[in-house]
Structures are given as structure tokens and as C-alpha cells.
């Protein structure tokens, strides 16, 4: 039986809020645009698809123009993060190395093209992951990307690890088990399965896959 763990990225595998905020504000300066981004604003769009971010980041701007600005931000962000990557969570590489010996690991994110790749390369994590998919690749919702990747890779069972209520809802739509990374950005009431740090993940994953 092929068992896999799918990971969200922001708030689950790294925290890049400060880097994104700095990069996007530099982009607005470069383009002489009146928009600016605070820490809280960037945090509020973590986990949203590109289209979902536009009314928050570029309020009052028509979608086509907002998307062009968003794409400029993302283009600069990719370059910025390659030199100044997000912050990994404690014990992350140790945990991923352990999990990768037993399960196949993937990243499923609502990010745009290039963002997941940036995490994998700049943090040297490619060796632990079998693949990834993002909203920018497919233009699909996260639950659809979960099912797409599951079918594409011939996976029998999936556990999704994410930090937000949206992640939990998307996992439910895809009919896969969800683990709340409560150290991340989101708050979930009545979360059935959660971890407060990554060191707790291997034991909980083993328990859920073995039906204990």
C-alpha cells in the first residue's frame, strides 16, 4: 500500500512572511505604485490562491491590473527568496529525513509557480520530497490538487499536514486525513489531530496510518 504525506508550505514547512513583505514593498517602489504591505496583511493571505489574494492586496483595482501587479510581486519574490529564504521550523530536516524513509512526501500549496521550488532548492529539501503541485501550476483548488496528485502518483492513502482552517476544509473535501500544524499561522477550534511542533509528527502519522 502506497502511503504519502502531503504538506502545506507557508506556516507548515517555513515562515517567509517578513521576506515576502520586504520583497513586495520593494516591487511597489520599483513600479511607483501606491500600494504597501504590512506583516499582518501578508500573513492574512498565506494559504490563499493568487486570485483570492487580489482584493486584499490591491483593493479597488480591477482584476486584470491587480493580477499584473501580483505577478510582478511574485517574479521579484522568487529572486528575493532564492537569496534570503524563509525560516524553517525547528527540527524540520531531521523530521523530514525520518518520514521520507517510510512514506512518500509531497508539497501541495496554493502558491504561484516557482514558490515551492524556491523552498525546495534554497533550503536544500529536494531529496526528501517526491514531488509537488501548486495552484499556479493547475489553476485548481487545493482539494482538487490533492486528488490530482493522489491519482497521478497512484497513492492509496494520504495524510495532509497544514496550519489553517482552509487546509482542514480542503482536506475534508478531498476525503483525506488532516493534521493541524498548530505552530503555524492558523487557529482551528476542535482540531481532532494536531501537532505543536514537527517532532510530534512521525508518531502521530504512524498512529493514523496504522489505525491505532
Model regions: which residues?
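Asp-based, Mg2+/Mn2+-dependent phosphohydrolase catalytic module
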Residues: 1-3, 113, 119-212
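N-terminal helical cap/lid subdomain that shapes the substrate entry/recognition surface
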Residues: 2-90
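Conserved SAM-binding loop
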Residues: 6, 13, 105, 160, ...
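Conserved phosphate-coupling serine/threonine residues in phosphotransfer and NTP-handling enzymes
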Residues: 12, 109-111
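Short beta->alpha linker loops
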Residues: 19, 49, 87-91, 111-112, ...
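Structural motif corresponding to alpha-helix initiation and N-cap regions
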Residues: 36-39, 51, 89, 93, ...
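Short, acidic loop-to-helix structural element flanking the phosphoryl-transfer center
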Residues: 79-107, 117, 143
Amino acid at each position: 500500500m502506497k502511503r504519502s504525506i502531503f504538506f502545506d508550505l507557508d506556516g507548515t514547512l517555513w515562515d517567509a512572511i517578513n521576506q515576502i513583505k520586504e520583497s513586495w514593498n520593494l516591487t511597489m517602489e520599483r513600479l511607483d505604485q501606491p500600494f504597501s504591505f504590512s506583516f499582518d496583511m501578508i500573513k492574512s493571505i498565506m494559504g490563499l490562491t493568487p486570485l483570492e489574494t487580489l482584493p486584499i492586496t490591491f483593493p479597488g483595482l480591477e482584476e486584470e491590473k491587480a493580477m499584473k501587479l501580483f505577478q510582478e510581486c511574485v517574479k521579484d519574490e522568487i529572486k528575493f527568496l532564492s537569496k534570503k529564504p524563509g525560516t524553517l521550523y525547528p527540527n524540520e530536516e531531521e523530521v523530514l529525513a525520518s518520514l521520507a524513509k517510510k512514506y512518500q512526501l509531497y508539497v501541495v500549496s496554493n502558491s504561484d509557480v516557482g514558490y515551492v521550488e524556491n523552498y525546495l532548492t534554497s533550503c536544500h529539501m529536494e531529496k526528501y520530497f517526491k514531488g509537488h503541485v501548486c495552484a499556479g501550476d493547475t489553476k485548481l483548488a487545493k482539494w482538487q490538487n490533492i486528488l490530482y496528485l493522489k491519482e497521478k502518483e497512484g497513492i492509496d492513502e494520504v495524510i495532509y499536514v497544514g496550519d489553517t482552517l482552509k487546509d482542514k476544509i480542503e482536506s475534508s473535501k478531498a476525503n483525506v486525513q488532516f493534521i493541524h500544524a498548530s505552530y503555524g499561522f492558523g487557529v482551528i477550534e476542535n482540531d481532532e489531530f494536531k501537532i505543536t511542533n514537527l517532532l510530534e509528527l512521525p508518531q502521530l502519522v504512524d498512529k493514523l496510518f496504522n489505525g491505532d
